């Protein structure tokens, strides 16, 4: 794993104060690789929106593009001259803030390693 996925983990650590790999890799229908069905709770919706955001990125691979950002007032400001990499940074920044803002509804007992049959509904559009 390199590039943006490592940076995404860093942004989650900075903003949500927890490990993205540990807390969000196998959660709900959309957190982790792939995604199917309907988002199960607000945290899973963060991942759904992040997947949709990555799907709209053009001219670079969002999973490997390395972007630049600065930390300002306990927040993240995406920078750099490459519009594609800046878009990837914004996807990651918004998702990390979403994780932070939805910690109180995170339910590992209910949604951690959710069986695939729970994610069979027709997905909603991005």
UniProtKB/Swiss-Prot annotation:
<keyword id="KW-0964">Secreted</keyword>
<keyword id="KW-1199">Hemostasis impairing toxin</keyword>
<feature type="binding site">
    <location>
        <position position="34"/>
    </location>
    <ligand>
        <name>Ca(2+)</name>
    </ligand>
</feature>
<feature type="disulfide bond">
    <location>
        <begin position="60"/>
        <end position="84"/>
    </location>
</feature>
<dbReference type="GO" id="GO:0050482">
    <property type="term" value="P:arachidonate secretion"/>
</dbReference>
<dbReference type="GO" id="GO:0042130">
    <property type="term" value="P:negative regulation of T cell proliferation"/>
</dbReference>
<dbReference type="InterPro" id="IPR033112">
    <property type="entry name" value="PLipase_A2_Asp_AS"/>
</dbReference>
<keyword id="KW-0378">Hydrolase</keyword>
<protein>
    <recommendedName>
        <fullName>Acidic phospholipase A2 S1E6-b</fullName>
        <ecNumber>3.1.1.4</ecNumber>
    </recommendedName>
</protein>
<feature type="binding site">
    <location>
        <position position="30"/>
    </location>
    <ligand>
        <name>Ca(2+)</name>
    </ligand>
</feature>
<keyword id="KW-0800">Toxin</keyword>
<dbReference type="InterPro" id="IPR033113">
    <property type="entry name" value="PLipase_A2_His_AS"/>
</dbReference>
<feature type="binding site">
    <location>
        <position position="51"/>
    </location>
    <ligand>
        <name>Ca(2+)</name>
    </ligand>
</feature>
<keyword id="KW-0106">Calcium</keyword>
<dbReference type="InterPro" id="IPR036444">
    <property type="entry name" value="PLipase_A2_dom_sf"/>
</dbReference>
<keyword id="KW-0443">Lipid metabolism</keyword>
<dbReference type="GO" id="GO:0090729">
    <property type="term" value="F:toxin activity"/>
</dbReference>
<dbReference type="Pfam" id="PF00068">
    <property type="entry name" value="Phospholip_A2_1"/>
</dbReference>
<keyword id="KW-0442">Lipid degradation</keyword>
<comment type="subunit">
    <text>Homodimer.</text>
</comment>
<feature type="disulfide bond">
    <location>
        <begin position="46"/>
        <end position="98"/>
    </location>
</feature>
<dbReference type="GO" id="GO:0005576">
    <property type="term" value="C:extracellular region"/>
</dbReference>
<comment type="function">
    <text>Snake venom phospholipase that inhibits ADP-induced platelet aggregation. PLA2 catalyzes the calcium-dependent hydrolysis of the 2-acyl groups in 3-sn-phosphoglycerides.</text>
</comment>
<feature type="disulfide bond">
    <location>
        <begin position="29"/>
        <end position="119"/>
    </location>
</feature>
<dbReference type="GO" id="GO:0047498">
    <property type="term" value="F:calcium-dependent phospholipase A2 activity"/>
</dbReference>
<keyword id="KW-1015">Disulfide bond</keyword>
<feature type="active site">
    <location>
        <position position="92"/>
    </location>
</feature>
<dbReference type="GO" id="GO:0005509">
    <property type="term" value="F:calcium ion binding"/>
</dbReference>
<comment type="similarity">
    <text>Belongs to the phospholipase A2 family. Group II subfamily. D49 sub-subfamily.</text>
</comment>
<feature type="disulfide bond">
    <location>
        <begin position="31"/>
        <end position="47"/>
    </location>
</feature>
<feature type="binding site">
    <location>
        <position position="32"/>
    </location>
    <ligand>
        <name>Ca(2+)</name>
    </ligand>
</feature>
<keyword id="KW-0732">Signal</keyword>
<dbReference type="InterPro" id="IPR001211">
    <property type="entry name" value="PLipase_A2"/>
</dbReference>
<feature type="signal peptide">
    <location>
        <begin position="1"/>
        <end position="3"/>
    </location>
</feature>
<feature type="disulfide bond">
    <location>
        <begin position="52"/>
        <end position="126"/>
    </location>
</feature>
<feature type="disulfide bond">
    <location>
        <begin position="78"/>
        <end position="89"/>
    </location>
</feature>
<feature type="disulfide bond">
    <location>
        <begin position="53"/>
        <end position="91"/>
    </location>
</feature>
<dbReference type="GO" id="GO:0005543">
    <property type="term" value="F:phospholipid binding"/>
</dbReference>
<feature type="active site">
    <location>
        <position position="50"/>
    </location>
</feature>
<dbReference type="InterPro" id="IPR016090">
    <property type="entry name" value="PLipase_A2_dom"/>
</dbReference>
<dbReference type="GO" id="GO:0016042">
    <property type="term" value="P:lipid catabolic process"/>
</dbReference>
<keyword id="KW-0479">Metal-binding</keyword>
